[in-house]
Amino acid sequence: MTLQLETRHDLTPNEVDAIEDRFYEHNSHAIGRHDGQGLGFVIRDDTGQMIGAAAGYTWAGISELKHMWVDKAYRGRGYARALLDAFVEEARGRGARRIWVASYDFQAPGMYEKAGFKRMAEFAGWPAGHSNIILCKTLIERSDTNGVDQSI
């Protein structure tokens, strides 16, 4: 069999989903946890048009908020915070101990910090003149830590 490396800068959504599925299968097998679930909320106007969404997942006692968006015309009205609060509560209800999110400095790191997230890392110059900030929030303190501080 001959394999070829092919340049593809236009993967389809189905191809990206297939890659993510393979990552999940590998990671789940590696740690013996197959409890991954998508987690998402959408806000729609009275015509059914989506004006905001929060999407991510829970898996192996953690959660990641991968995407948060509110239409520009609806920003500043508390919709992003409502989406974030719903996402956090659902993750907590599923037993996630921690939740993390990445936010550029020109997006919403302040909103996450007001909601109790703490900065864990900041990548300056990502992109040039800006930073990519990783934030994390502890949802459930672990009781089986053998004296190791698990809070963030």
Regions found by a protein language model. Give the residues of each.
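Conserved active-site tyrosine of GNAT-family acetyltransferases
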Residues: 19, 112, 117
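Conserved GNAT acetyl-CoA-binding A-motif
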Residues: 91-104
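Conserved beta-hairpin
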Residues: 36-54
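Conserved N-terminal entry element of GNAT/NAT acetyltransferase domains
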Residues: 1-11, 141-152
